Amino acid sequence: MVTALSDVNNTDNYGAGQIQVLEGLEAVRKRPGMYIGSTSERGLHHLVWEIVDNSIDEALAGYANQIEVVIEKDNWIKVTDNGRGIPVDIQEKMGRPAVEVILTVLHAGGKFGGGGYKVSGGLHGVGSSVVNALSQDLEVYVHRNETIYHQAYKKGVPQFDLKEVGTTDKTGTVIRFKADGEIFTETTVYNYETLQQRIRELAFLNKGIQITLRDERDEENVREDSYHYEGGIKSYVELLNENKEPIHDEPIYIHQSKDDIEVEIAIQYNSGYATNLLTYANNIHTYEGGTHEDGFKRALTRVLNSYGLSSKIMKEDKDRLSGEDTREGMTAIISIKHGDPQFEGQTKTKLGNSEVRQVVDKLFSEHFERFLYENPQVARTVVEKGIMAARARVAAKKAREVTRRKSALDVASLPGKLADCSSKSPEECEIFLVEGDSAGGSTKSGRDSRTQAILPLRGKILNVEKARLDRILNNNEIRQMITAFGTGIGGDFDLAKARYHKIVIMTDADVDGAHIRTLLLTFFYRFMRPLIEAGYVYIAQPPLYKLTQGKQKYYVYNDRELDKLKSELNPTPKWSIARYKGLGEMNADQLWETTMNPEHRALLQVKLEDAIEADQTFEMLMGDVVENRRQFIEDNAVYANLDF
């Protein structure tokens, strides 16, 4: 068992004077969504990240190297670190111990004054007080000054004054809390995998820190994972490229600071065609990119072109590579730490600090240029790969023009098979990608033509994992999708131009249907990933069975549901079961009622919880290495629904 308290630690003047107070907690319980995004399962897990982020802040400041997260019985969460321990002396303005102020006053914390932490994570600094306000119970133990201090709270209200409960030779903080079921009405049960994925990501992003996750809810089956990466994001890139063929053995790695901005970049090219670029600012995944990404891309393109021309690999200036060309087959991670990050964009996941662009550009270009001149063989391979990508880009240009839709209102350029909806408001519009023309006919007849568009897809689309953009854009089904969506593709992609905010994959419930679904998801992940990140991609859930008893009809979506229904129904009158092999077997009314009607249907939203897992899965299922795919199928066949 790991204990995350520290034996010896420098407390470095981290005291009550550095805890600033901005405002009270009154609004948090009334409008929790404003502070944690939602009160769904996602918001529940966000509580854990707020506490863990405070421990990470201690680590970033150099005072902690062990963090432990435990899911206890009844879904209590315990987070322990071996930092300096939250200050316990009296905070001057409030006249209360600093630890109590941090846990009861909104935006009170070392991260706001500049004197406590140079850099802090904590998504926009919501803080421990919000977790306290939204918890049925919370308790804190502080190991500091050779003393253990303790205080407990209910719904954010202290139950007694901070008290001394023992002596200790360690330093650090332990926080235990149980989310309030009155607030989190959807669920208060934590998902181990969700916590595990983010904890692994945090361990990659903060090299040298050991983060342990343990699940003690089942005494007989305690689960534990511990993550510690001395290589940091360099190890992250190696893991992402695990199923690929790297062009150079070691990732190119830089870790430097300039103007109080810490820049860490790892990059490795592989023989594939897809670009995999992940960016972070203060441990927050910046899905929408930002100035750190801009600076990196600008430097990469400039340096590769300069090297290609000066080394005569590229013959003339007109052979210049575009940014997209230079990133083909690239896996890269950019992580910056900034004292005052400015987040913008639709989901507040785009870095806006203009000064970061120049710092990243300068630091990366100097390092990358040196790498190319010191490794001429690797440099030649990378430049030649870019030249091949440029040729494919030129070939793809005409095909790309064909897919371009001028605006959401531009009907003339729409594909012929598309039955569009009449509404021009993307927020309420949805498009169903339907397997086969016959099912397409039924869905066109059964839809709500005001908000629902139908695009039938004939046969299997191209496996984009094994193809360059020019070949991809020559695939008729892919071209029709790109045109219909209106967003463009790859480097031209613009989420703001999306014609539909729901893209629903609707395939048969058989092996072919699953394959088509995987091909479509691979395409979206590799070339239209922002659609997934924005939550626009869904999978329809057509029924598997129709059970008829007299005049009563029941539509059933899985075997478990069928068994339950059969056990509940009276044996008389006699009932019959029909299994649907395909969407085409249902008439328009049945499709509407079971699969398309927003009042009754079930849709699965496609989420990107774990970039590592997603990337490796697509590479394994759709890539060139047959052995990995065979192993995956053998390992997971037991979980599959087999229909003989």
From Swiss-Prot:
Cofactors that this protein relies on: Mg(2+); Mn(2+); Ca(2+)
Cofactor comment: Binds two Mg(2+) per subunit. The magnesium ions form salt bridges with both the protein and the DNA. Can also accept other divalent metal cations, such as Mn(2+) or Ca(2+).
Binding site for Mg(2+) 2: 508, 510
GO terms of molecular function: ATP binding; DNA binding; DNA negative supercoiling activity; metal ion binding
Any one Gene Ontology cellular component term annotated for this protein: cytoplasm
Alphabetic keyword roster: ATP-binding, Cytoplasm, DNA-binding, Isomerase, Magnesium, Metal-binding, Nucleotide-binding, Topoisomerase
Broad EC category: isomerase
Example GO biological process: DNA topological change
Entries under SUPFAM superfamilies matching the protein: ATPase domain of HSP90 chaperone/DNA topoisomerase II/histidine kinase, Ribosomal protein S5 domain 2-like, Type II DNA topoisomerase
EC number: 5.6.2.2
Residue span(s) of domain Toprim: 429-543
Reaction(s) the record says it catalyses: ATP-dependent breakage, passage and rejoining of double-stranded DNA
Binding-site residues for Mg(2+) 1, renumbered to this chain: 435, 508
Residues flagged as site, Interaction with DNA: 460, 463
CDD domains: HATPase_GyrB-like, TopoII_Trans_DNA_gyrase, TOPRIM_TopoIIA_GyrB
Cellular localisation: Cytoplasm
Quaternary structure, from the entry: Heterotetramer, composed of two GyrA and two GyrB chains. In the heterotetramer, GyrA contains the active site tyrosine that forms a transient covalent intermediate with DNA, while GyrB binds cofactors and catalyzes ATP hydrolysis.
Family to which this protein belongs: Belongs to the type II topoisomerase GyrB family.
Additional remark text: Few gyrases are as efficient as E.coli at forming negative supercoils. Not all organisms have 2 type II topoisomerases; in organisms with a single type II topoisomerase this enzyme also has to decatenate newly replicated chromosomes.
Chain's role: A type II topoisomerase that negatively supercoils closed circular double-stranded (ds) DNA in an ATP-dependent manner to modulate DNA topology and maintain chromosomes in an underwound state. Negative supercoiling favors strand separation, and DNA replication, transcription, recombination and repair, all of which involve strand separation. Also able to catalyze the interconversion of other topological isomers of dsDNA rings, including catenanes and knotted rings. Type II topoisomerases break and join 2 DNA strands simultaneously in an ATP-dependent manner.
Protein name, as recorded: DNA gyrase subunit B
Organism annotation: Staphylococcus aureus (strain MRSA252)
Gene: gyrB
